[in-house]
């Protein structure tokens, strides 16, 4: 990792939420801390966070909760928030709403800053294979692209193949980045510590 590299982070907020919920069973992430883990000691230029606004009329409680979260996200230094909208069809609530405009906004920002040479490394927090074409274009422009992924989602396979570097995100890496603190392990089972080898002494895996 080159400390002189200029880094921009592009976060698909919905993907981050569902990845945290599905893999780590909690969503109270401190976005600023999370991004610091991703950039390591490199130079952060900008964070772009994308999400879709929940309908106030359709889901008032979820809307208020989301607005509180957005307010906290906006406090993160060097972060720009890009908001799309959720589209509710006539089949609601039997059929969940869908996002509109998020992938286009993210792709536009990713490519615009690439062509302007505003970053050396782009870090993409997303699991959608639709970003593969944009990532390849960024690479063709001479920049590197890292993709932060949770677990081994099937949808992430194309991203793994095109990315210059894959950042495997798990609970160990996110230690210290939870707003509600660390959760205690199940006390019914004793703690086990692996043998202290050189690799076990490293807090982060080689990709980070």
State where each predicted segment sits.
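Terminal and domain-boundary accessory regions
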Residues: 1-208
């Amino acid at each position: 990792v080159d400390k002189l590299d200029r880094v921009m982070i592009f976060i698909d907020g919905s993907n981050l939420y569902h990845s945290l919920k599905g893999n780590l069973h909690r969503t109270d992430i401190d976005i600023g801390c999370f991004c610091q883990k991703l950039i390591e000691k490199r130079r952060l230029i900008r964070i772009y966070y994308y999400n879709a606004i929940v309908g106030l009329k359709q889901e008032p409680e979820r809307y208020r909760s989301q607005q509180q979260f957005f307010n906290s996200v906006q406090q993160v230094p060097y972060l720009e928030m890009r908001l799309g909208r959720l589209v509710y069809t006539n089949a609601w609530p039997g059929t969940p709403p869908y996002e509109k405009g998020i992938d286009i906004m993210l792709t536009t920002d990713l490519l615009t800053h690439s062509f302007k040479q505003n970053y050396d490394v782009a870090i993409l927090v997303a699991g959608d294979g639709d970003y593969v074409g944009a990532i390849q274009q960024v690479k063709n422009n001479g920049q590197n692209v890292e993709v932060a992924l949770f677990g081994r989602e099937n949808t992430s396979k194309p991203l793994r193949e095109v990315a210059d570097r894959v950042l495997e995100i798990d609970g160990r890496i996110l230690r210290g980045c939870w707003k509600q603190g660390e959760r205690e392990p199940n006390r019914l089972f004793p703690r086990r510590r692996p043998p202290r080898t050189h690799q076990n002494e490293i807090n982060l895996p080689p990709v980070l």
